[in-house]
């Protein structure tokens, strides 16, 4: 039976500062490193053994995966990285303080930019220090497909081809697949797997550093409800994510 393990990266330095991060490459905070280590301990304690790893191209997801797999004694498994698993591109909001952005735009527009399904923030200018123009990570990617801003709908559009064409093959061969990625790329994947509506996806918050497990059937649909390896910590973490921007 295919098994999928989703891990949102641990707290990053910009999560700690309450900044919109998106495609800006920042590292894990000290707390984030601890969360990643705990994720690995949970994998080992619960006997969930990934056979192959997928991550985004961003350091915080890569760090999380490396720390977790070392704790789980699985650092040796094959690794694949793709920009298609990157966080949502937050456009002109990248690098901005969430609380200040809330004050500037008001709660309705802030929530629209942050949580609506199909409304992206204003695009980032190529001259911005938080733009990815010229970033070496993407030098082999067609520049016409690289975003300057994204909604969750656009994240799903660029994520699903990679899921269907690449990740699915490992799952269908019976492997346990671990994906270490980001709040919005993982929300998009969970939406696809669970058939969550465009309206209801706004309510889904994925906590940092706690493995979420899907047991899938031969059609890669959940054969039972998904579950966190630490449900109590996951509930508290999801509530903290929901409150971001309010301090």
Swiss-Prot record:
What is the predominant subcellular site recorded for this chain?
cytoplasm
Protein EC: 5.4.2.11
- Mode of membrane association: Peripheral membrane protein
Q: Which GO biological process categories is it annotated with?
A: gluconeogenesis; glycolytic process
Cited Pfam families? His_Phos_1 (PF00300)
> For this protein, what is any one GO molecular function term?
phosphoglycerate mutase activity
Q: Where is this cross-link: Glycyl lysine isopeptide (Lys-Gly) (interchain with G-Cter in ubiquitin)?
A: 31, 57, 71, 139, 175, 191
Its UniProt pathway annotation is: Carbohydrate degradation; glycolysis; pyruvate from D-glyceraldehyde 3-phosphate: step 3/5
Statement: the UniProt record of this protein carries the keyword Membrane:
yes
Please name the InterPro entries in this protein's record.
His_Pase_superF_clade-1 (IPR013078), His_PPase_superfam (IPR029033), PG/BPGM_mutase_AS (IPR001345), Phosphogly_mut1 (IPR005952)
Residues annotated as carrying Phosphotyrosine in the record are 49
Activity modulation:
Inhibited by inositol hexakisphosphate and benzene tri-, tetra- and hexacarboxylates.
List site positions: Transition state stabilizer.
182
Q: Which reaction does it catalyse?
A: (2R)-2-phosphoglycerate = (2R)-3-phosphoglycerate
Query: Remarks, anything else?
Result: Present with 172000 molecules/cell in log phase SD medium.
> What is stated as this protein's family in its record?
Belongs to the phosphoglycerate mutase family. BPG-dependent PGAM subfamily.
Name-wise, this protein is: Phosphoglycerate mutase 1
Q: Native species of this protein?
A: Saccharomyces cerevisiae (strain ATCC 204508 / S288c) (Baker's yeast)
- Designated gene of the protein: GPM1
């Amino acid at each position: 039976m295919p098994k999928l393990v989703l891990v949102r990266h641990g707290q990053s330095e910009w999560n700690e500062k309450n900044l919109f991060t998106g495609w800006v490459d920042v590292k894990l905070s000290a707390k984030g490193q601890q969360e990643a280590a705990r994720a690995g301990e949970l994998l080992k304690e619960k006997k969930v053994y990934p056979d192959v790893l997928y991550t985004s191209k961003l350091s915080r997801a890569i760090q999380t995966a490396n720390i977790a797999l070392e704790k789980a004694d699985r650092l040796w498994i094959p690794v694949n990285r793709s920009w298609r698993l990157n966080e949502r591109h937050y456009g002109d909001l990248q690098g901005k303080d969430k609380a200040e952005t809330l004050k500037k735009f008001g709660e309705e527009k802030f929530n629209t930019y942050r949580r609506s399904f199909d409304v992206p923030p204003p695009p980032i200018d190529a001259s911005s220090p938080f733009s990815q123009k010229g970033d070496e990570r993407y030098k082999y990617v067609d520049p016409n497909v690289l975003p300057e801003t994204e909604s969750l709908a656009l994240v799903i559009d660029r994520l699903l081809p990679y899921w269907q064409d690449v990740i699915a093959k490992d799952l269908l061969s019976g492997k346990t697949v671990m994906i270490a990625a980001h709040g919005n790329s993982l929300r998009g994947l969970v939406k696809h797997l669970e058939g969550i509506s465009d309206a209801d996806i706004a309510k889904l918050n994925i906590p940092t550093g706690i493995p979420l497990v899907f047991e899938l059937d031969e059609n890669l649909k959940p054969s039972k409800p998904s579950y966190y390896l630490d449900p109590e910590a996951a509930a508290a973490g999801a509530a903290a994510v929901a409150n971001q921007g309010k301090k």
